[in-house]
């Protein structure tokens, strides 16, 4: 039975809150498309549910793929960055949704490795082709290819595992930071920056551009820099992040897909923090993206995202015998214009970013 439930709209800028919500349209995907675990996820990370009963737009729209055939799905776009290229997190999240639909309910993703091979076209949908590489008793591997205009734009390998106990356990300690309730949200922080009369025009333009974007996630920066610190920043940052709206406890696979979406937002910019004052970024793209999932979590509850960039430079020179082992690593490339208008155009720079997603109870959930 359908009935309508009023939902208060917080602001005219928030496209993810609507005036009326038809509950019959907001239910979880039907049994054929449901990716939830048969057991409800015990919520240990705290923080409570977001207010209201509005289903997260990440579940109802962004990550709700249309099945076309067995192991073939179509995804549409919800938010397109100002670069007019497809958001990398959307492609990763949708690809993981497609892969997760091809495995049993009792197995969950533990790692994925992705390559972005072409720029995505925001004017057309994306087709996701799943190959069942291996289905074993404990582990299953799926290959996903995202296609536009008959050519792959993205390839991904995802590994799934049955939940099994482990006698060996350890982890780093979560950084000691203020809780999200003590911090300004993204919108309030931007307004604070814009109210400073000493803010340089290039920062003002960039902040206004960010403020105009409508994204289905919420962010609160930890120790946000002052205006005077913007020109002298290290390549590391931390912020609390969660999906807008409600996802629920039991859908473990969907929480992983939402985390894959969120993992690419504000992540790559970590490598540029020490350089923005000196160079104008022409464009920046992901080259590859890897994730490891360690423990159940809720992506609609606040999680601490710890990001750092240990290296940026150019490709070349002799190969070093050392090996770089990274966590939550993403390799990116960008082209830059030096701040001087008389300098030559340069490009080909690359950077590496590591990240960790912590539950607020101190458990390392994703890296």
Label the predicted regions.
Residues 2-8:
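Extreme N-terminal basic, low-complexity initiation segments
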Residues 16-326, 332-338, 342-367:
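Terminal targeting signals and extreme-terminal segments of soluble enzymes
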């Amino acid at each position: 039975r359908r009935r309508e439930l009023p939902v208060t709209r917080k602001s005219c800028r928030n496209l993810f809150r609507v005036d009326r919500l038809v509950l019959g349209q907001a239910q979880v995907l039907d049994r054929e498309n449901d990716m939830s675990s048969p057991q409800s996820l015990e919520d240990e990370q705290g923080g409570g549910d977001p207010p209201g009963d509005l289903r997260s737009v990440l579940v109802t729209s962004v990550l709700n793929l249309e099945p076309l055939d067995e192991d073939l799905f179509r995804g549409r776009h919800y938010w397109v960055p100002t670069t007019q290229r497809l958001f990398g997190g959307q492609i990763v999240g949708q690809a993981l949704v497609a892969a997760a639909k091809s495995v049993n309910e009792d197995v969950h993703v533990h790692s994925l490795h992705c390559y972005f091979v072409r720029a995505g076209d925001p004017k057309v949908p994306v087709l996701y082709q799943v190959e069942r590489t291996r289905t074993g008793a404990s582990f299953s591997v799926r290959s996903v290819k995202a296609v536009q205009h008959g050519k792959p734009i993205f390839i991904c390998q995802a590994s799934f595992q049955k939940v099994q106990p482990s006698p060996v356990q350890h982890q780093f300690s979560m950084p000691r930071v203020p809780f999200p309730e003590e911090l300004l949200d993204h919108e309030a922080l931007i307004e604070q920056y814009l109210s400073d009369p000493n803010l340089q025009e290039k920062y003002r333009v960039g902040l206004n551009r960010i403020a105009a974007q409508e994204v289905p996630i919420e962010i609160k920066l930890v120790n946000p820099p002052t205006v005077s610190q913007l020109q002298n920043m290290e390549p590391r940052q931390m912020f609390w992040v969660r999906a807008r709206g409600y996802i629920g406890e039991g859908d473990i696979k969907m929480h992983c897909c939402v985390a894959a979406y969120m993992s690419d937002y504000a992540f790559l910019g970590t490598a540029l923090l020490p350089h923005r004052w000196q160079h104008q970024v022409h464009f920046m793209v992901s080259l590859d993206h890897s994730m490891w999932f360690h423990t159940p979590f809720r992506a609609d509850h606040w999680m601490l995202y710890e990001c750092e960039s240990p290296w940026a430079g150019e490709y070349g020179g002799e190969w070093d015998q050392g090996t770089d082992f990274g966590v939550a690593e993403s390799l990116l490339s960008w082209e830059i214009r030096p701040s001087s208008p008389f300098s030559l155009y340069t490009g080909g720079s690359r950077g590496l970013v590591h990240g960790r997603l912590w539950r607020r109870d101190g458990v390392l959930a994703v890296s």
